[in-house]
């Protein structure tokens, strides 16, 4: 099982806790309490149906446009430009098509998604832009989904090749999947919290092949990740470095958050959904504890309209941009975890998810095709600050994962849904 303690390397001058608390400035008075959060309205069943239909209409409208090509990771002025199948985000669009197909049973959607599966097979066979850890984001929502829904052998083969590709990034020293860059390089010897959502691809690979090696490495990575990225107060680091010589944990830093000690909203949301997925596959109760902690921190830091700022350094009244996508991810994680909890706690997290989805639907859902060719507005891909390492990209725009997770959460509320993850 996972170990709850934090094992810190000799190079840690500050523990994650002290680093975080010295820097934390959000006033308690501005935080959501359980009472203030639960005072918000839930999305009704009819509103769920209406919002999902509205989202599906947008997918149907965009399929001819994004058939051979894909929407970019983020929109520009709320309209996605076209890109080839070369980014870590391409799978989200194909996932949206599969969700729309499941709801409508429209053969045109199935055909379009399978057409893209062939594109994904070509990508992994030719090793086009796959030297990173995001094989799950790319292949769970495109090819595993296709295999589960249609039995496509081509999809199964592509997804297994992607799983093998991900396995090549496992670092024995440290027991984690290296996210980016040249394997073993000192400046890239780290994991990132997002990778929790790449692990389901490996659990699936073990299920369909009978080979436990995929599952074993996934479990090792999850154990390592949760030990180092979750701080004592339930907030999270975006990325964590290890010593390539010894494998010892070294330090938590941000790439896309405001600064190393802040709480990047989407990182926190990957933690929420990642814990739910970890529990789904390993049933270790420690992941329920982690889930409660990270979900609680996420909800506490929401402003009064429940649409999260891109980083939780920012609070009510700030003019910093929001990241609606992180709330959609959290809603999915809550609805997944609710399957495994007792009745009372399951009802609580389902109710929390409904409140988040009500806020997203009221404030962030596109109005019509003149406004956007995406679905969920007010997302932020990357916001550059003097204390992080990213460039501005998709600030207050649509992001493909925001569209996808918003749809997934609505689908989860409409019916029993077998996940693609």
Feature-to-residue mapping (PLM):
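A generic alpha-helix propensity feature with a strong bias for hydrophobic helices
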Residues: 16-19, 74
């Amino acid at each position: 099982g996972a170990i709850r303690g934090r094992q810190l390397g000799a190079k840690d001058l500050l523990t994650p806790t002290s680093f975080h608390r010295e820097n934390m400035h959000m006033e308690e008075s501005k935080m959501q309490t359980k009472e203030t959060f639960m005072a918000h309205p839930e999305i009704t069943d009819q509103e769920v149906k209406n919002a999902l239909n509205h989202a599906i209409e947008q997918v149907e409208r965009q399929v001819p446009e994004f058939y051979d090509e894909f929407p970019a990771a983020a929109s520009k002025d709320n309209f996605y430009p076209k890109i080839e199948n070369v980014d870590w985000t391409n799978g989200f669009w194909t996932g949206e098509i599969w969700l729309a197909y499941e709801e409508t049973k429209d053969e045109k959607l199935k055909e379009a998604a399978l057409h893209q599966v062939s594109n994904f097979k070509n990508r992994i066979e030719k090793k086009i832009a796959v030297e990173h850890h995001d094989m799950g984001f790319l292949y769970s929502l495109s090819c595993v989904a296709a295999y589960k829904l249609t039995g496509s052998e081509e999809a199964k083969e592509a997804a297994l090749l992607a799983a093998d590709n991900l396995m090549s990034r496992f670092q024995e020293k440290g027991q984690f999947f290296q996210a980016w860059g040249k394997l073993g390089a000192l400046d890239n010897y780290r994991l990132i919290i997002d990778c929790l959502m790449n692990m389901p691809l490996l659990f699936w690979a073990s299920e369909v092949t009978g080979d436990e090696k995929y599952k074993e490495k996934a479990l090792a990575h999850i154990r390592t990740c949760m030990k180092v990225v979750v701080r004592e107060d339930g907030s999270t680091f975006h990325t964590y470095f290890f010593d390539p010589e010894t494998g010892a944990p070294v330090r938590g830093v941000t790439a896309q958050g405001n600064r190393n000690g802040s709480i990047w909203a989407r990182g926190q949301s990957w933690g929420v959904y990642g814990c739910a997925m970890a529990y789904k596959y390993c049933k270790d109760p420690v992941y329920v504890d982690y889930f409660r902690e990270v979900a609680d921190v996420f909800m506490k830091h929401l402003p009064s309209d429940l649409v999260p700022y891109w980083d939780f350094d920012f609070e009510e009244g700030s003019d910093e941009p929001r990241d609606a996508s992180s709330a959609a991810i959290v809603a999915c994680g809550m609805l997944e975890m609710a399957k495994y909890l007792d009745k009372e706690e399951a009802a609580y997290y389902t109710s929390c998810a409904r409140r988040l989805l009500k806020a997203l639907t009221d404030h962030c859902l596109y109005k019509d095709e003149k406004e956007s060719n995406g679905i969920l507005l007010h997302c932020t891909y990357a916001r550059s600050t003097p204390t992080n390492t990213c460039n501005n990209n998709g600030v207050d725009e649509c992001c493909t994962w925001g569209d996808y997770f918003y749809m997934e959460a609505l689908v989860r509320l409409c019916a029993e849904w077998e996940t693609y993850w």
